[in-house]
């Protein structure tokens, strides 16, 4: 969501300066993976609960549910996930390590630079079909257009641009999301 769009999804005071913790429960097809701002706990087939968040602006509340293919890792105690639709699985698996390496390097640099550890728990990066923005810095669950998963040989500039977008969205965790 963007600023002032959360009101289209749920009842809220949709102002960036008003923050609240969120606890979300999702009912989705049992075969789907549910991702969001908090760590997901499967309660029963098709029922997922997302951990209560730190106080967030309303437009950061994020739920990404679908038959995702996922590559998971961990860096410095932070669970990481890279997710895309199943039809992109071979491309995601081929490119995931480069994105994990960029993500890890950014965490190391931002922790050093800002002196504040990443405060939002898990860090998922979800490549969403038909996403109308380049990317969105949702705490714990950053969304990107799925065109950033390359379907063929990528130029060095394309890889750089994706890496730059990953770094940019992560910087928002400290500048925008945390404050």
Residue ranges and their predicted role:
Residues 1-6, 11-167:
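Hydrophobic helix-coil surface modules that form long, contiguous segments used
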Residues 170-179:
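Catalytic Zn2+-binding segment of zinc metalloproteases
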């Amino acid at each position: 969501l963007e600023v002032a769009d959360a009101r289209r999804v749920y009842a809220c005071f949709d102002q960036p300066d008003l923050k609240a913790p969120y606890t979300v429960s999702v009912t989705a097809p049992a075969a789907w993976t549910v991702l969001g701002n908090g760590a997901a706990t499967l309660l029963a087939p098709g029922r997922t609960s997302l951990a209560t968040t730190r106080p967030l602006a309303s437009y950061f509340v994020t739920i990404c549910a679908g038959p995702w293919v996922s590559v998971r890792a961990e860096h410095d105690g932070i669970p990481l996930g890279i997710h895309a639709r199943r039809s992109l699985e071979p491309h995601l698996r081929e490119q995931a390590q480069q994105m994990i390496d960029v993500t890890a390097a950014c965490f190391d640099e931002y922790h050093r630079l800002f002196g504040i550890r990443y405060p939002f728990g898990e860090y998922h990066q979800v490549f969403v079909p038909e996403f109308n923005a380049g990317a969105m810095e949702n705490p714990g669950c950053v969304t990107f257009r799925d065109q950033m998963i390359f379907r063929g040989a990528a130029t060095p500039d394309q890889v750089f641009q994706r890496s730059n977008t990953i770094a940019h969205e992560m910087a928002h965790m400290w500048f925008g999301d945390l404050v």
